[in-house]
Amino acid sequence: PITQGNRNPLLYKNIGADGIKTGYLAVERYSLASSIERKGRRLIAVGSGFETKSSRSRESTKLLTYGLTNYDLVEVNRSDKAIDKVNVWLGKEKNVNVYVNEDIYKTIKKAKKKLLKVTVKYDGPVEAPIKKDQKIATLRVVYDQELVGEYDLLSSKEIKKVNFLTRLIKSINYLIW
């Protein structure tokens, strides 16, 4: 059998790199797609046009180190966590918890963490009846004044409508007050 070592130089440095691919073309020169994983976060760096193998290794290491040093993976919300309560009109309950059905993470600059804003948008109160998992609001994620994500907010449970007499009283109350 023929044994051939891996040509990715980052695998042999003590930085934790675990892949991906080296290359060489006469036109593009040396290239490297590299990958590293730390604390559940994976960074991938791709570079080409390097004149030498050593510059390919050095610049790829710099790029991965820059990413690890200057960026964080921030948990915006977990799918099993209620985000907010939304007011319910004419329901047997006054409000309902809302949640997102997926975990939300964003990669942001460490120095700008305070620029990450999360808001709930809905036209409320929401009128009953409400079904479980019905979309009733939107979660907006803004980073550095740019919208980076919108997610459906779903009701955590079913809310039934109050009976006719209660609806009538609440409606009259609303009109008077």
Residue ranges and their predicted role:
Residues 1-177:
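Domain-terminus/edge residues, biased toward the C-terminal soluble/receptor-binding domains
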